[in-house]
Amino acid sequence: MLYDIHHSAAATFDKALEEILAAVKQNSQIPLRVVIFGAPKSNDEYLKQRQQIELAYREAYPAESRPLVAYVAHAPMDATLVAEVTYWEQTPKSIEYNDDYIVIDNDYILSGGLYSDIELHTGLQADNIFKRVAEILSVEGVSPANIVRQWNYIERITDITPDGQNYQLF
């Protein structure tokens, strides 16, 4: 897998998203996953922007070749939006697209955009997401021991609530 980073310092979210999408589409490799980092001011703005990102990618790519898209509320340095894009190094023999994961050459699973209701307690969000991961692994006949890279984003990761630190709850 190859990774590329695209930045946009455009003045507005809309223009930055347009620039990121154009940069991803310019690459001759097949984009498999796009993780976009931005700085929404609230959960409501985050949800609105996430829907906007998902719509932009649905309009830009047909379902059978649409990259997985995730939006992370983490302010990028010196940019409005930053995208980490995962590309496959060579032309794969097969790619099976699902809603929140892709199977490459019947050998690799790439997931992205696994979300839970952001109004839920952090522990419940974690339970929901890990249940979905377990479902994907079960459907594909893969053991959790075969996970190579797992990357979690937890809102207010260092906050401490009466139940404990958000990171520990996750």
Predicted regions and their residues:
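Short, polar/acidic, helix-capping and beta-turn segments at strand->helix junctions
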Residues: 1-170
